[in-house]
Regions:
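Histidine-centered divalent metal-coordination motifs
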Residues: 21, 52
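Conserved catalytic core of two-component histidine kinases
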Residues: 75
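Pre-recognition alpha-helix immediately N-terminal to the DNA-recognition helix
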Residues: 11, 22-24
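C-terminal regulatory/oligomerization modules of transcriptional regulators
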Residues: 1-8, 27-41, 46, 55-58, ...
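Short helix-coil-helix linker/hinge
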Residues: 15-20, 80
Length: 113
C-alpha cells in the first residue's frame, strides 16, 4: 500500500468511525439533501452537522454543490465501493494469515503425537 492510498484509507475509515457521519452518508447516498435539512435530523447544532459533512467531503464520500443560498450534499457511491474493496483486501490478507496459523498448529500437533 502506498503512502497516498494509506492516507486515503485513513481518511475514509476516520470519516466512517462516527455514527452520525455514517447516518449522514446513508441519507445522502439515498438522495441529495441540503445541509440545513440534514441538520434538523440531529440533536446538535447546524455548525456541528456542517463539520461532519466536511469530514465526509474531505474523505471523498460525498460532494457538495451550491443551489442559491443552500448547500446540497450527495453521496459518492464510488468512494463507498473503494471502502468495500479495501475491506475485501484486508479480509483476504487475514484469511491467509489465519490459514498459515492453522497449518502451524496442525504441524505442532503432529510433532507432539
Amino acid at each position: 500500500m502506498t503512502d497516498e492510498s494509506a492516507d486515503r484509507a485513513d481518511a475514509l475509515f476516520h470519516a466512517l468511525a462516527d455514527r452520525t457521519r455514517r447516518d449522514i452518508l446513508r441519507r445522502v447516498l439515498a438522495g441529495e439533501h441540503s445541509i440545513s435539512t440534514l441538520a434538523v435530523k440531529y440533536d446538535m447544532s447546524f455548525t456541528a452537522v456542517q463539520k461532519h459533512v466536511a469530514v465526509l467531503e474531505k474523505a471523498g464520500l460525498l460532494t457538495k454543490r451550491r443551489n442559491g443560498r443552500e448547500q446540497l450534499a450527495r453521496g459518492y457511491v464510488e468512494a463507498v465501493r473503494s471502502v468495500a474493496s479495501m475491506l475485501t483486501e484486508l479480509e483476504r490478507v487475514w484469511r491467509g494469515r489465519i490459514a498459515r496459523i492453522d497449518v502451524l498448529i496442525a504441524s505442532d500437533s503432529d510433532q507432539e503425537d
